[in-house]
Amino acid sequence: MERLHSKELTAVQKNARDVGDEIHTDRHIIDPVAYDMLYLASFGINSRGKAAGQSKGQNNGINILPNSKPDEKCLERYRTNEENMKALCRMCARHFIDVLVGTTLKQAGLTLPKYWEDRIVKAVRKALLFDVERKKLCVWMDSEHIWYLPLKGIVLKDYYPSVGMRQMSDNDILFDAEAWERVEKHMLSEGYEAESVGNGNHDVYQKPPVYNFEMHRSLYGKGHDERWVEYYSDIKNRLLSDQPEVVCDAVHGASENTTANQTESVNGGNSSCGYHMSDEDFYIYITSHAYKHYSGNGTGIRTLLDFYAYLNAKEESLDFDYIQTECRKLGIRDFEKRNRRLCWKVFSSQQIYDRVSFEQSLSADEMEMLKYYLSSGVYGTFERMIENRMEKQKKTDGRGKRSKLTYYRHRVFPGMELYENYPLLVKHRFLIPAYWFYRIVRMLFSKKRRNYMWREVKAVKKVTAQESFNEQSNC
């Protein structure tokens, strides 16, 4: 597969290997285990805990359930039934919320099996190791006067009740692109391996036992929506400084809605060159990032939970006129509104344990969106990636239905968005036909690439067959 999609593919393959692809939701109703996961997650995310910037004894608008124990009918399904417990753990792991749900069960008095307890311990340990290593990196960047902006999970984790509840696989940090060589040299000197440098818009560094940093030179790049690339091309000018009195070759000032405690929590207390977005801009960014995955491989319940956690703390103070104006520019206004409405319905103070009533409370559009989240898993699925690619191609070509032939043609002869990752091909376009030949030969002599090709062919057949079946069913 091309470098443009290599990270997404790796995540999809890892997700399938770890928890299996066979878990899915019924076409008409929500799977009982999936419903229990949502029900228990709503208790976990609303449980008492210290959210970002929240002092002891303060609520800060956090929605806390008056009765924090789930219904006994739900708990009884997992108290003594090992198969039910295993199915729930696998479902939660697939969506990367097994720590949140497992902790909720423990707090309700259930004894977790060892394999689930081990996952919680490892997740908490990983979160603590990430925090220490990230602080070291930020201190070094401070000393080098390299500006940086912690992204996504680094910020969102502080809106969850306790350490490790918001599980993370890596640390995403935007930094001064002009300093990439210094950053690479430093990471290598610290024992990291450069898994990918100079490909796409971020560099990937990994080190045992768990360390994984994605150092972003830009928020979006080649292959992403051009509106997003342009919108975030001047992001530096819209950032706010964690310490406004210190200048690190960037513009910044403190967010009105961001507390000193939150800033310290995000950047480890040493943030002279650290930056953050305003609350509104951060929300817009995570919405665009969520939509990137939602419309690509798909994305799971953790994404919806992230939105609830953030909105639960911030919604009353957010300027939604500004948010909707900016989301319209990015082409994600409809997604933002639908997503915001759904996360509240799924996670806010849900205490009545009744799957049928819950399903009836959702509109047809909300039900379809929720089932899409449930069927994707945290990293999406391979078939979802193929389906969304074919749908995008159908719209681009103005066709009435998905075409296998058109899909294969674009895969063998991809557009310029792929070639732009190869400076030689951009400069000497006459070499592109030779690259086509090289890709075909490389596939013939690589078992891994041949296996991937056959897997893709099967997925394309399945997607087109499902479309034909749906058309016949609607006749």
Stretch-by-stretch model annotation:
Residues E2-G57, G61-S169, F175-C475:
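Conserved NTP-donor binding/palm subdomain of two-metal-ion nucleotidyltransferases/polymerases, i.e.
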